[in-house]
């Protein structure tokens, strides 16, 4: 994407990304059985601190109860009823694997649905229901904090951020505004300035929230940013969300001046993010994308996933090819807002951020099989989570593994070695 992206959609290029990507195989580590693992984390903490990292934010949603594949929009379009599936063997079976009512992913207790609250009660509920599957648990964040900060004079602050999980354009745009407000809060609370860095690790569609935030951070995005902020302010006023209007009023002047972080730098790592929105790197420090990926293709294009029907319907139940949520939750898919006001505002945001709509366009985007966006570095990782089990709770179609406790050392090592220089 151009340096000044201005909310353009990613071009979803299938070209070889070359030196932008590396390939790794995971080595799980259980800290309770490995003092050397704790020592390694402490060394990584020193390297992070040396490079100015003062805050690490662990941003996530919930795989449960949120239409993680975004089939509501595809069903609303009625692709199967309108004959788009004629001649495409296995398409109805694929949609059944993606659909909430038939994919085996449980609902949240009490029918809890997005927007999810970023509060202790909801976080505890997720920890109880889904554990460390696509979820940065309190245990994970606390262990990260303790292990990184051993021996540091200035501790690195570790923060857990649960986004609303509204898997549509409006929800992600509102979450981007909230996140920018929080970034400002943290910059002030921890007295960050020139030379300091905030590192955000974003799982799944939380990465798309950060992609929108990167466009809002760009000093050059004036007209589109104003248009989007005005749209969101009007919607927030309509539904009595004064927190959104207040945040926009507070951050808009700072965004225009490039002063939101008070001179600090924002680094972003995405974990299993579907490729949709384009990134604007001009307001970021570093950008890295990590994807659970196993090479199944026969054409030598090792950097692409495999999306062949009907074969995918046999590969997906055991997560054979890696992360299928990352692969399939692309343009055209989405949850659907529940109110008329939400639907109208979502359509207006849609027109700014994503030119694709329609069942056939979704299928076209999915078949592009792109693992990485056009901006940033990438790591393709075989996380070894395909064991032959068809129990979705074991792998959640390859989307759960990034936040597992036994992956903390591996992920942190890869992130630090890729983004931050040795002392």
Predicted features and spans:
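Intrinsically disordered, low-structural-confidence terminal and linker regions
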Residues: 1-47
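Serine-dependent carboxylesterase/thioesterase catalytic core
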Residues: 43, 169-311
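Proline/glycine-enriched tight loop/beta-turn segments at coil->beta junctions
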Residues: 49-53
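Active-site catalytic motif of lipid deacylating hydrolases and related acyltransferases
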Residues: 56-196
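Lipolytic serine-hydrolase domain surface
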Residues: 59-75, 85-93, 112-117, 123-138, ...
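Noncatalytic linker/hinge segments flanking ATPase motor cores
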Residues: 96-106, 201-205, 241-243, 309-318, ...
């Amino acid at each position: 994407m151009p340096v000044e992206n201005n909310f353009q959609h990613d071009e979803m290029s299938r070209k070889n990304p070359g030196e932008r990507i590396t390939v790794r195989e995971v080595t799980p580590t259980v800290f309770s059985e490995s003092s050397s693992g704790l020592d390694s984390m402490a060394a990584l903490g020193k390297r992070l601190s040396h490079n100015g990292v003062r805050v690490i934010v662990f941003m996530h949603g919930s795989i449960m109860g949120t239409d993680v594949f975004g089939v509501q929009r595809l069903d609303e379009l009625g692709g199967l009823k309108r004959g788009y599936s004629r001649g495409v063997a296995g398409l109805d079976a694929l949609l059944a694997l993606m659909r909430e009512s038939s994919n085996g992913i449980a609902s949240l207790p009490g029918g809890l649905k997005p927007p999810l609250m970023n509060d202790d009660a909801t976080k505890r509920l997720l920890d109880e229901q889904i554990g460390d599957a696509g979820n940065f648990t309190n245990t994970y964040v606390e262990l990260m904090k303790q292990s990184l900060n051993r021996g540091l004079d200035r501790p690195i602050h570790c923060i857990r951020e649960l986004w609303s999980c509204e898997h549509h354009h409006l929800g992600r745009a509102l979450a981007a505004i909230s996140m920018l407000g929080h970034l400002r809060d943290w910059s002030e609370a921890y007295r960050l300035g020139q030379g300091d860095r905030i590192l955000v690790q974003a799982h799944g569609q939380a990465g798309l929230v950060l992609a929108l935030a990167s466009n809002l951070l760009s000093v050059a995005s004036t007209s589109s940013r104003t248009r989007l902020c005005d749209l969101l302010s009007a919607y927030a006023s309509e539904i009595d969300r004064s927190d959104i209007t207040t945040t926009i009023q507070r951050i808009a002047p700072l965004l225009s001046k490039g002063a939101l972080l008070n001179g600090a730098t924002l680094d972003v790592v995405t974990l299993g993010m579907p490729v949709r929105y384009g990134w604007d790197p001009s307001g970021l420090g570093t950008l890295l994308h990590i994807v659970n990926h196993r090479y199944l293709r026969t054409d030598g294009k090792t950097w692409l996933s495999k999306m062949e029907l009907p074969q995918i319907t046999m590969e997906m139940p055991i997560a054979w090819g890696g992360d299928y949520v990352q692969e399939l939750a692309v343009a055209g898919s989405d949850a659907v807002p529940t109110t008329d006001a939400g639907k109208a505002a979502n359509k207006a945001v849609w027109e700014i951020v994503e030119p694709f709509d329609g069942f056939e366009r979704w299928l076209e985007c999915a078949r592009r099989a792109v693992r990485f966006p056009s901006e940033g570095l990438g790591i393709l990782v075989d996380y070894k989570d395909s064991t032959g089990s068809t129990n979705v709770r074991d792998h959640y179609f390859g989307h759960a593994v990034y936040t597992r406790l036994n992956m903390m050392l591996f992920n942190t090592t890869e992130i630090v070695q890729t983004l931050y220089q040795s002392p």
